[in-house]
């Protein structure tokens, strides 16, 4: 890779060294507000600007069973995701466990099951369009870490199955047309979000030269059918009128799985 003018070492690294988080090797990355499930765990707030795009109140150290993990929330879009992953690599993080929301495309999951409102999904790989990903990779499809994908499949503890998907990574939430979604379906995609390809690409190629093991799981918050009809729990939730599925609350099941099960398996090197 050609040298670049700024790196985490020359920017945040002027104040914070690689050992800043004292040996923590796992980071949770929330592409949404933190769900209420975090209230189950002791959390220490950080006080400094360790990440250029994240406010200190969005960065916590969460502990369960004596195991601390770094928790980042309100990470949105490609530029923020990629910069944050670059900085995590500088800080010595080895595993990134991401969670968030996505729109369903009205098709079954990769294994054929219905992928409806409130379904849990596991992003096996992501279709890149433009935006941030091409700065890191020329590939059109960017994979998650295959070992982590398998770990999620084997160890998932949620109340409903978690379904494997390909995520289309868009860059403008208010510019998603029927024609665009049809192209995503033709590309083998099951959901659309704003982050998966960027997240995975920066995990594979970054200024630290480190390959972070990264996976993203989430909850379907709205569905656009092939005929263009829209069902959106997210819109109802934002209007403070949700009466059925609350997708943000359901991300708490993913957070619990990451903190209580997957993190321990990774540290204990359980296959």
Language-model segments: what does each one mean?
Residues 1-150:
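Metabolite-binding pocket within alpha/beta catalytic cores that recognizes anionic/polar moieties
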Residues 32, 103, 168-173, 198, ...:
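Glycine-rich beta-alpha junction loops
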Residues 70, 97, 121, 165, ...:
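Hydrophobic/aromatic beta-strand patches that form the interior of the parallel beta-sheet core
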Residues 109-126, 205-221, 231:
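A short alpha/beta connector and helix-capping loop motif
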Residues 140-191, 196-198:
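Active-site rim beta-loop-alpha module in soluble metabolic enzymes
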Residues 151-159, 202, 257-269:
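Generic non-transmembrane alpha-helical segments
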Residues 179-226:
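A C-terminal functional module that forms or caps the active site or interfaces directly
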Residues 224-271:
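His/Asp/Glu-rich mid-to-C-terminal helical/loop segments that flank catalytic regions of hydrolases
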């Amino acid at each position: 890779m050609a040298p670049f003018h700024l790196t985490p070492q020359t920017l945040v690294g002027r104040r914070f060294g690689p050992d800043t988080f004292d040996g923590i090797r796992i980071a949770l990355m929330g592409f949404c507000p933190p769900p209420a499930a975090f209230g189950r765990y002791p959390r220490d707030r950080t006080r400094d600007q360790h990440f250029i795009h994240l406010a200190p109140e969005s960065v916590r150290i969460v502990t369960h069973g004596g195991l601390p993990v770094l928790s980042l929330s309100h990470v949105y879009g490609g530029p923020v995701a990629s910069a944050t992953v670059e900085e995590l690599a500088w800080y010595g993080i080895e595993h990134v466990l991401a969670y968030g929301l996505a729109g369903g495309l009205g098709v079954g999951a990769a294994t054929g099951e219905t992928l409806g409102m409130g379904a849990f999904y596991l992003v096996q790989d992501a279709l890149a369009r433009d935006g941030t990903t091409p700065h890191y990779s020329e590939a059109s499809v960017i994979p998650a870490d295959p070992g982590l994908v398998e770990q999620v499949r084997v160890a998932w503890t949620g109340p409903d199955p978690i379904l494997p998907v390909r995520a289309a990574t868009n860059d403008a939430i208010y510019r998603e047309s029927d024609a665009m979604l049809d192209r995503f379906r033709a590309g083998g995609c099951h959901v659309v979000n704003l982050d998966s390809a960027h997240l995975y690409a920066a995990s594979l190629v970054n200024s630290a030269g480190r390959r972070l093991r990264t996976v993203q799981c989430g909850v379907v918050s709205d569905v656009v059918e092939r005929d263009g009809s829209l069902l959106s729990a997210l819109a109802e939730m934002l209007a403070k009128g949700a009466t059925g599925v609350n997708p943000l609350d359901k991300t708490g099941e993913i957070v619990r799985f990451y903190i209580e099960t997957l993190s321990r398996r990774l540290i204990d090197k359980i296959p």
